[in-house]
Regions:
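Conserved loop-to-helix N-cap of the C-terminal "lid" that shapes the substrate pocket in Rossmann-like
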Residues: 107-113
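Rossmann-like dinucleotide-binding domain that binds NAD(P)(H)
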Residues: 1-24, 111
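Stable alpha-helical structural segments in soluble proteins, enriched in small hydrophobic residues
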Residues: 84, 88-92, 120-130
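Hydrophobic, well-ordered secondary-structure elements that form the walls
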Residues: 96, 113, 130
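C-terminal glycine/acidic-rich active-site capping loop/insertion
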Residues: 3-6, 33-107, 139-141
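Hydrophobic residues in alpha-helical segments
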Residues: 99-101, 117, 126-127
């Protein structure tokens, strides 16, 4: 379980032994106006549910990536063709090279990576101690 500074709560789970999963790195945001779902196994899609839909016509809709989204058009000129894992690696490499040459900022930077590591350590310690643990408590630990 997680609790954010703004009061939002959530849950995180991880498993390397979940049967039937290949690369189910995913997140789901459930909010007052709807739900948004991303799954790495289908990374060219977002699933969106909007709470204000008419009864009987409600349900998730699938938003597909296309040329209007980021670097997609550099690989595919039209929607529906989808980019793959290798294209993502090319995009990541280009962004890294641009950062090395000072054309863009690198993300995450070392400070952000440190903050992410504190969150992971807080989660590990919280699980080990069966208590709430804040990333702020992980300073210099």
């Amino acid at each position: 379980l997680v609790q954010f500074e703004n009061g939002c709560r959530g849950s995180l789970e991880a498993s390397w032994v979940a049967w039937g999963r290949k690369m189910h790195l995913s997140f789901e945001l459930n909010c007052s106006k709807g739900t948004l779902v991303f799954n790495q196994e289908r990374f060219n899609e977002l699933r969106l549910y909007e709470a204000n839909q008419r009864p009987g016509r409600d349900g998730f809709k699938t938003l597909e990536s296309g040329p209007a989204h980021g670097d997609y058009a550099k690989f595919c000129p039209a929607s529906g063709h989808q980019i793959g894992f290798n294209e993502l690696k090319v995009i990541e490499l280009v962004e890294l090279l641009k950062a090395i040459h000072g054309k863009t900022a690198c993300w995450p930077d070392f400070r952000e990576a440190y903050e992410i590591q504190k969150i992971l350590e807080a989660a590990r310690r919280s699980s080990a101690d069966s208590t709430w643990c804040s990333p702020a408590q992980m300073e210099a630990s």
